[in-house]
Amino acid sequence: MEAKYIDYDETRCFSSTVTRLVAKEDSLKPFINQFPDLKAFKNIISQRKFDGNRDSLVESLIHQYENISTQSTLLKSNIKALGESNTFTITTGHQLNIFTGPLYFIFKIVTAINLARELKSAYPDKNFVPVYWMATEDHDFEEINHTYIGGKKISWKLNATGATGRLNTKSIIQALNEYKGILGISKNAEKLSEMIAKAYADEKNLADATRYLANELFGEFGLVIVDADDKSLKSQFSPIVERDIIEQNSFKNIEESSKKLATINIHAQVNPREINFFYLTNDLRERIVFEDGKYQVLNTEISFSEEELKQEIKENPEIFSPNVVMRPLYQEVILPNLAYIGGGGELAYWLQLKANFDFYQVDFPLLVLRNSAMVADEKTVDKLQKLNLTFADAFVKTEALKKKYVLQHTQHELNLSEEWANLKSVFDDLKLRVQQIDPTLAPSTEAVAVRLKKALDSLEKKLMRAEKRNFSEALNTIEKIKNQLFPGGGLQERKENFGLFYVKYGDDFIPELLKHFKPLDFKFTILH
């Protein structure tokens, strides 16, 4: 593969928050630690105060990997290294989308691995471990029960409740067979089919299935996969859980930050609640609310007095599940983390969280925008070249690109702006004459000019439509290029699964991403 890099704002596909982060806008400084570069990492390494229990972290990970038979030397080394004070993590997180979900799941992890490598080169006396934090406690099954591959939606049909990580994968067989059918029968297809089948077989839970699959894809590169739905890990977080439920500090802190962000035109991505924890059991994840002097679990008969709540948190910390605004704090309490790698939407809500980290005296990580990319096959590249279009052109909206193409290649003048300029000059003279004769007729003159302008605009559109018919073959090719690179009208990485790319490139696919992704350059990557 070869790579081209373009600025994010050239793609017209990213929010203003992303472009402002990439531009290192001063107004964002109160909401971050530092803007990410090698110098910032040097600073944060020296400043990071990690009070978590490293031994407990290592023990939990060893236990979580007990049923993973394929453990690379680098993976084992990284888990062991987490027990040492000179080891830090580079973390990304994601839900347990079936069959890995959209491409950006892969891109997130590749970014984390590459950044860990880059930091090791810069600071060889330290260890840097890439971490994938599985969102095993998330209960939004509708967000993770499907994936798109080759333009087809594959869905896992199940009436699911509770944490998705605890779901049994027995009923996924139909979706699995559909997915395998799209992969085909090539050698690479068979290899991936076998990998996926093993991941979800034997009635595993979804957390174990996802760990297996992510380890098969990334274990050789040292990726450590963390399932934080773990009693030992949660016990380290329980003092904050107790204090936050009772004092409702996160609600106050994050609400205040959201108001401040609104003054610089960054609007809240997440809304904190008075209590930002769920009550979690095998088939239940319900909000905790404070009502009538008691802590009530919604839609149940379960309730606690303040003293009962404290005792429950102490004895059963695993029952208390942080929501989207408290999960990042939990992550930073149990991991010796330096940076969180996320997409634009994720980093936007992290901007709301720094004040809460400061309140609880937990170090806030550097926020690193994940690598975004598009993979173009040879046929698509060929079509672009034949039409003399660049990859940057491909990001122009379809109709605008078609119009641009026609204007560049037509032998006729389709733009009537010169004619309108001439007519406008005539009308300006006419208005002066009318003004001298009867000023009350000036609006009528203006109305005639407006009608004529509309008529010229309409004629210009008709000329363009007529000329487009003369370029129908090229314009149809533009449609095909756009559909290939932007499935469903959006970025490829946000929709298409990695499966068919693995079928095409095999075991070279991820190494090619590792080769070309540059985690601290903050450019959009086009691979072809």
Language-model features and meaning:
Residues 102-103, 116-140, 365:
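Glycine-rich phosphate/pyrophosphate-binding loops
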Residues 1-70, 93:
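N-terminal leader/transition segments
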Residues 141-148, 375-407:
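A structural-propensity feature for long, helix-poor, extended segments
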Residues 103-104, 140-147, 236-241:
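Short acidic, glycine/serine/threonine-rich loops at helix termini
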Residues 148-175:
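A glycine-rich helix N-cap at a beta->alpha junction
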Residues 3, 213, 217-304, 308-311, ...:
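Long, compositionally biased intrinsically disordered regions
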Residues 85-120, 342:
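N-terminal catalytic cores of NTP/NDP-binding nucleotidyl/phosphoryl-transfer enzymes
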